[in-house]
Curated annotation (Swiss-Prot):
Domain of life: Eukaryota
Annotated protein name in UniProt: Protein CWC15 homolog A
Taxonomy of the source species: Eukaryota, Metazoa, Chordata, Craniata, Vertebrata
Role noted for this protein: Involved in pre-mRNA splicing as component of the spliceosome.
GO biological process terms on file: mRNA cis splicing, via spliceosome; mRNA splicing, via spliceosome
Gene (name only): cwc15-a
Main location: nucleus
Coiled coil spans: 121-165
Keyword Cytoplasm part of the UniProt annotation: no
Compositionally biased tracts (Polar residues): 24-34
Pfam families hit by this protein: Cwf_Cwc_15
Assembly behavior: Identified in the spliceosome C complex. Component of the minor spliceosome, which splices U12-type introns.
Record localization: Nucleus
Disordered: region residues: 1-126
Length: 228
């Protein structure tokens, strides 16, 4: 049996290689598995939430500081937006000369916004009414289907009851009625060992023995039952 597949747990000993005449000297060839590994201990770093760091931190103060920074950034962006919106509105107001202003002029942007808001409210109300109508129709359709299903199940149940009772199933054809009234054979009519004691008295009365297989009573009964 070969030993080539067995692992080597120690380096080979020298003495047989080229220039290795001293048998007591170990070989310089060694396996990487024999080298020491994990020679340094890994310490917990400063950002790995050591128990001492967690106990010394003030989480509430850090949370408040982060909230203040976020609020400061929001307040810093808000004036810029207001300034840009006011600058964009000024040219449109300046473009309208004062002499052309009249009471019969079309509605301003604010009035148009109000009208659009009213239109959107009307559209929303119409959509909600349509949605409610659709929901009501679906509920009615579901109730109707459930009633139809219950009626069909009741009809099938009554049909099964009437067809299962031969005394009530007189409305069908004559052949079906005759078949339903026919007496069924028992499951053990043609079994092998049925009525084993039948005919014992007759056999006792005869008390005869024939040393012939073809003229024996068993052979006669067998031929009469299966051949004739």
């Amino acid at each position: 049996m070969t030993t080539a597949a067995r692992p080597t747990f120690e380096p080979a000993r020298g003495g047989r290689g080229k220039g290795e005449g001293d048998l007591s000297q170990l070989s310089k060839q060694y396996s990487s598995r024999d080298l020491p590994s994990h020679t340094k201990i890994k310490y917990r770093q400063a950002t790995q939430d050591a128990p001492e760091e967690v106990r010394s931190r003030d989480f509430r103060r850090e949370l408040e500081e982060r909230e203040r920074v976020v609020a400061r950034d929001k307040n810093r962006d808000r004036p810029t937006r207001e300034h840009t919106s006011s600058v964009s509105k000024k040219p449109r107001l300046d473009q309208i000369p004062a002499a052309n202003l009249d009471a019969d002029d079309p509605l301003t942007d604010e009035d148009g916004d109000e009208d659009s808001d009213e239109d959107s409210d009307d559209d929303t109300a119409a959509l909600l009414a349509e949605l409610e109508k659709i929901k009501k129709e679906r509920a009615e359709e579901k109730d109707r289907k459930e009633l139809e299903q219950k009626a069909e199940e009741e009809r099938i149940r009554m049909e099964n009851i009437l067809s299962g009772n031969p005394l009530l199933n007189l409305t069908g054809p004559a052949a079906q009625s005759q078949a339903s009234f026919k007496v069924k054979r028992r499951w053990d009519d043609d079994v092998v060992f049925k009525n084993c004691a039948k005919g014992v008295d007759e056999m006792k009365k005869q008390k005869r023995f024939v040393n012939d297989t073809l003229r024996s009573e068993f052979h006669k009964k067998f031929m009469e039952k299966y051949i004739k």
